[in-house]
Amino acid sequence: MIHSKTGSNRRILTFPAVQPCKSISLTTLLDSLIQLAGDILTFKQKHFSTNKRSFQKTIRQIQNLAIVLEEIRIRVGSPRRYFPGVSSLSEIHVIFQKLKFLLEDCTRDGARVCMLMSSDQVSDHLQVLTLSISTSLSAFPVSFVDLPSEVNELIDLVVQQARKHVVRPDSDDKKVIDSVNQVLALFENRVSPEPDEINRILDHVGVRTWGDCVKEVNFLGEEIEAERLENKKNNNNSNARVELLSSLMGFICYCRCVILNKRSSSSS
């Protein structure tokens, strides 16, 4: 569960984007888009628990798109008549909101192991958003804006890159996911895993301290409760997701009590 600054709650991998109103002015829409692009670019230096390479490519595309939006903002000024590009820009605004939510999920402290195990789902979401950027941007009526040739070329570049960008989990992610599943299988058979294997998993997702583990456990507890409520609401008797989350909580508790205690002892 994500607790926002406004006090609202959002389940991970849900994207409650708000469609800009039809009467929005072009300048207001562009200003909001430029702000959203800036927000997205702040994730460039953050630690991604999954799909790092794909996100880096997408952020580079947003960086180029931010340049385009700034140039459009300068060129169009404050038009008195309806601008035909508002529709495609509104679509991009929704895409940016969803992308920001996805970036928040994949860099969130406490959700690192959970997001790693959702790597395929993250890839699917990012693929859809990337293709949507290409579709919406290609529909933008560049003929209505007197843009420099290099900016038009940048638009074409972003469209082509987004269209060709195949999103898939990083190979390192897949290896670590396999390791997590192997460790969970060992726990089920009451066998202790190799500490080196556990350390490799923790280093990959960025869980390094006792406090990190506490955040992971708290988040997983919230997700388990939310999942149970959702299942009850939908009369869903499937416990697969709850079982996975519970197993991950057990894994993190083991890491906190056994592995990180050993790290602390050896460093003191």
Q: Model segments located where?
A:
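Alpha-helical bundle protein-protein interaction modules that mediate dimerization/oligomerization
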Residues: G77-C255
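N-terminal amphipathic alpha-helical segments
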Residues: I2-S78, S136, F140-L147
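Onset and early core of a folded interaction/catalytic domain in large eukaryotic regulators
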Residues: K233, S265-S268
